[in-house]
């Protein structure tokens, strides 16, 4: 499946070493001011090659809007956006065209489809997430009109955990670190792994404030369930926590319950959802990313002809995919919340009367 969402749908297309990648965002209400500079700035945050902590592949990621916008406003029709690939080096993958790279989707794609684009992983490459960020930027513009703000940052790298959640600091950090006190250690861990032809994992914290009460569609389209689905659909994501997540299994009910006052909740262990519906508190999501599977070490694998061989990779790869993954997490949260906002419009007669009355 290449489409995400119910009322607001994002369909992406393209491959890592193809001519272009892009998306079609359908369901955006007419009359939304489309800030193209903002969309580009979001792509610039995710684009590769900004520092030695990222892949050496340099792409401008310049986005072009093809449809759905007239005189700066959304028209209510599908918004199509395209990003042309300009820095492919497909020859780097000639030596792996007949073998399966450990940790990658090569093995499963080949056995599912009987054919695969071996150049940079083709459709399974994280390059595709640029299209998600473009669509997510439009969703952010929608949510801004509703007073919703989404932020993210790395709270852990290679087991080095931060204790501070400074989202303003993360905006200027090369690795989107939330805790300045551990940023240097986290950066050193990434660079050391890179020097040793290895990679590291990380954890991204994504939050949303200003979320209205009532978003989420029980029982099978709950807000927390869809957020988990959205994050798990990102390349290299291996686990998702909502609120206190796994830690809540170690609490007593008396510790885990968020008591309620007329001023609001006294705590936020639930992470902003109850019964799969937003409760008005801050949405809190942690996404755990595995180490980048592309490492420059000899590894055992097999070929498409069932031969055991040694794999030696080439190319340009992120030593820690979680860094740029933070921007993608924001995009997926934005798409989820914007979709939920549209779905919620018809849940009360009062809502319909406001529109049609």
Curated annotation (Swiss-Prot):
Superkingdom in the source lineage: Bacteria
InterPro entries: Chorismate_synth (IPR000453), Chorismate_synth_AroC_sf (IPR035904), Chorismate_synthase_CS (IPR020541)
Substrates-to-products reaction catalysed: 5-O-(1-carboxyvinyl)-3-phosphoshikimate = chorismate + phosphate
Cofactor names: FMNH2
Sites where the protein binds NADP(+): 46
GO biological process, one term: chorismate biosynthetic process
Positions that bind FMN: 123-125, 235-236, 275, 290-294, 316
Any one GO cellular component localisation term in the record: cytosol
Cofactor note: Reduced FMN (FMNH(2)).
GO terms, molecular function: chorismate synthase activity; FMN binding
Pathway(s) the chain acts in: Metabolic intermediate biosynthesis; chorismate biosynthesis; chorismate from D-erythrose 4-phosphate and phosphoenolpyruvate: step 7/7
Keywords assigned by UniProt, alphabetized: Amino-acid biosynthesis, Aromatic amino acid biosynthesis, FAD, Flavoprotein, FMN, Lyase, NADP
Signal peptide coordinates: none
Enzyme class, spelled out: lyase
Record's function text: This reaction introduces a second double bond into the aromatic ring system.
Assembly and interaction partners: Homotetramer.
Family of the protein in this entry: Belongs to the chorismate synthase family.
Protein name as annotated: Chorismate synthase
Gene that encodes it: aroC
């Amino acid at each position: 499946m290449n489409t995400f969402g119910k009322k607001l749908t994002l369909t992406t297309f393209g491959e890592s070493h193809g001519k272009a990648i892009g998306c079609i965002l359908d369901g955006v209400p007419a009359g939304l001011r489309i800030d193209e500079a903002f969309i580009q700035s979001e792509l610039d945050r995710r684009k590769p090659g900004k520092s030695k902590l990222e892949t050496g592949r340099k792409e401008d990621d310049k986005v072009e809007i093809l449809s759905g916008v007239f005189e700066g406003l959304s028209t209510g029709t599908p918004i199509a956006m395209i990003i042309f690939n300009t820095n492919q080096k497909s020859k780097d993958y000639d030596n792996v065209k007949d073998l399966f790279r450990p940790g990658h989707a090569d093995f499963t794609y080949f056995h599912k489809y009987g054919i695969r684009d071996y150049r940079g992983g083709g459709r399974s490459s994280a390059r595709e997430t640029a299209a998600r960020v473009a669509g997510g930027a439009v969703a952010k513009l929608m949510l801004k009109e509703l007073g919703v703000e989404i932020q993210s940052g790395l709270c852990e790298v290679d087991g080095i955990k931060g204790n501070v959640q400074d989202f303003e600091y993360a905006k200027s950090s090369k690795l989107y670190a939330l805790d300045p006190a551990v940023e240097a250690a986290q950066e050193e861990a990434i660079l050391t792994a890179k020097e040793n032809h290895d990679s590291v994992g990380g954890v991204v914290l994504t939050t949303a404030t200003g979320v209205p009460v009532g978003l989420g569609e029980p029982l099978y389209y709950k807000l927390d369930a869809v957020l988990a689905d959205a994050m798990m659909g990102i390349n290299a994501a291996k686990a998702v926590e909502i609120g206190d997540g796994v830690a809540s299994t170690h609490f007593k009910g008396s510790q885990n319950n968020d008591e309620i006052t007329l001023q609001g909740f006294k705590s936020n262990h639930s992470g902003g959802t109850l019964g799969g519906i937003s409760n008005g508190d801050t949405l809190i999501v942690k996404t755990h990313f595995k180490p980048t599977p592309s490492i420059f070490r000899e590894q055992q694998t097999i070929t498409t002809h069932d031969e055991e061989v040694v794999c030696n990779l080439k190319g340009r790869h992120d030593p820690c995919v979680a860094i740029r993954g933070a921007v993608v997490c924001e995009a997926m949260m934005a798409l989820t919340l914007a979709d939920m906002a549209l779905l919620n419009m018809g849940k009360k007669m009062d809502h319909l009367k406001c529109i049609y009355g």
